Swiss-Prot record:
Signal peptide: none annotated. It comes from Aster yellows witches'-broom phytoplasma (strain AYWB). InterPro entries: MetalPrtase_cat_dom_sf_prd, YbeY. Keywords: Cytoplasm, Endonuclease, Hydrolase, Metal-binding, Nuclease, Ribosome biogenesis, rRNA processing, Zinc. Zn(2+) binds at H108, H112, H118. Its main location: cytoplasm. This is Endoribonuclease YbeY. Single strand-specific metallo-endoribonuclease involved in late-stage 70S ribosome quality control and in maturation of the 3' terminus of the 16S rRNA. Its cofactor is Zn(2+).
Length: 146
């Protein structure tokens, strides 16, 4: 899988790029996924327009049928928008590193693009287990503060 990372914020995301690429590299699918880092204002705008929820959220996923970055490529899986400020806030709240939070949100968005949902407790547990499995492969366990 090819990961294309876009930064639409003033925050430095360079320290996270190699982890994100390493995390998705083992996936043998010949698709492109765009990870777009945005502000709370931008993600709130997207959340309001597409989900009718007028507040900032941490991560949003859009399949390639929408005209963001993914809409420009035939072999695109989709776009994952991550609010960098929300990731910072959640890392503090959950008492783990920003690296771990960003990785978690990227994996969460990826799984949504692959069709996973968490509308029921069963779906939530399946998705959580998959997230943990992917994070463990790069040394970021859900129960660790790394």
């Amino acid at each position: 899988m090819i990961i294309k990372i876009h930064n639409q914020t003033s925050f430095c995301i360079k320290p996270f790029k190699s982890l994100l690429i390493k995390m998705f590299l083992p996936i043998k699918e010949k698709k492109i996924m765009h990870l777009i880092f945005v502000t709370n204002e931008k993600i709130q705008e997207l959340n309001s327009f597409y989900r009718q929820k007028n507040y900032p959220t941490d991560v949003l996923s859009f399949h390639n049928d929408l005209t963001f970055f993914a809409g420009l490529e035939d072999n695109s899986l989709g776009d994952v928008f991550i609010s960098f400020p929300k990731a910072q806030e959640q890392a503090k709240t959950f008492k783990h590193s920003l690296e771990r939070e960003i990785a978690f949100l990227a994996v969460h968005g990826f799984l949504h693009l692959k069709g996973y949902q968490h509308r029921t407790e069963e779906e939530f547990q399946i998705m959580l287990a998959l997230q943990e499995k992917i994070l463990q492969k790069v040394g970021l366990n859900l129960d660790k503060t790394k």
